[in-house]
């Protein structure tokens, strides 16, 4: 059964469709958004090798002209060079505003293709077909598109909402276990930030989600998307509540910057340890009970994710370098550090004016070099 979740943004509203084997019906889903019957499918070489023929056949059956634009897999494609390459190839295809860009891949492809669509001829429509758990529950929904720079992650980008998101759970069958765990970090985030009941359901059913049991996986993805859609509809431009979706990300982005945004530390793995750190930092500041922080830590660890600096690739980390990366974070304002912290399980909030020295002391206590 396909679940349809609305992202209520007025004239830019769209649906996220969650279900099995949606790829085989992609032509029917995309056709209403095509004026000329042409789409450039931005994908990475691995995803295209695994699933490209299936998508291409479904689109061609519906009379859609398909132009694959393939990029190397991995975070390195989400760069100025990667963006220039994709936009140049879109120009070479002579796409116009009646055509469509289709992002077919994980978070890297979605961010890159979405940003290219946002700036191509001042904006062209695009559709997301996310192929990782992380992209299905998080990055494909909400219109954030960006590339990385040597100074930090996602620092250059735009808000550009897709016209449709197709989350086909069947493509997750080919997802490596490590990538599945990384995506689960974003699933558990929704419980930790605003739905204690969902967190407790994940404590009991997380193993089933990771094992890709259809009923559990469908519920986990659909509930995650529901929460993301509700928050985005309320606060599209991250002026308020949407910032809560960054739970764990201030720590995570600093760790990713230190490890070079590569395969050594996946984004979801960084978010996993980042959320555990955020809860323990909240407990250290007497904002939440220590038992809640430990419970959050245990639930993240149960998924096979790192929860301590000593377990994180790149260890040992330098506390001053991590704090310096945090000062570059988009959530930092006028030199003040902003964190998403917690008052308890399912109760996150935005904390501004966090003292850098308090963060540094906490990181040292967690095992970073002073």
Swiss-Prot record:
Catalytically driven reaction(s): 7-phospho-2-dehydro-3-deoxy-D-arabino-heptonate = 3-dehydroquinate + phosphate
Pfam families recorded: DHQ_synthase (PF01761), DHQS_C (PF24621)
GO cellular component: cytoplasm
Entries under InterPro entries matching the protein: Dehydroquinate_synthase, DHQ_synth_AroB, DHQ_synth_fam, DHQS/DOIS_N, DHQS_C
Binding-site residues for Zn(2+), renumbered to this chain: 186, 249, 267
Protein task: Catalyzes the conversion of 3-deoxy-D-arabino-heptulosonate 7-phosphate (DAHP) to dehydroquinate (DHQ).
Name of the protein: 3-dehydroquinate synthase
Designated gene of the protein: aroB
